[in-house]
Amino acid sequence: MHMNKLKILMLGPSESGKTTIANYLSESINIEEAGPPRPTQGVRIVEFELPNINVNGKNTNIDIELWDCSGDHRFESCWPALRVGVQGAILVCSPTTTQVATRELELLYNYFVSQPKLSAKQCVLFYNCTNDSDDIESLTLSSTFSKVSQVAINLKSGGNRLKIDFSNYITSVLQAINRYA
């Protein structure tokens, strides 16, 4: 099965860094150019090509449709539309959002991963560290997340690492889709 476009949702509490991560992955910005965060209104779709992804032993280019979703619950009425055709979910939280993150991520995982019957391999959690002393160990998640890959990211010191982690995640999504196709 040839997948040429993937619909990936980026979800998480407000002010966790979703838009900055989406912009960085799509190469819309250099991290040095990132201004102060502004709340996303509803959803913002960023499209870009991810080259040289290994699919069944062959390198291919994958078009990514990254849906940068607002963390504001006043847009919750849009959730059913966002979920249509979803093939993967990136959950994002940061040290500044850990207080609300546990409950919020559980809600988002249930609605956008469990209910549309995505596998845990089609989900990843990015813990957006804003400085080098931040530690993913400070995030306490339920057993729901035991099979979900959890990755600490730091755009300021490890942006290239994020791109590698993202490519690995996309490979995982493609493998899961091919397994259930």
Where are these regions (language model features)?
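TRAFAC-class small GTPase G-domain
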Residues: M1-A181
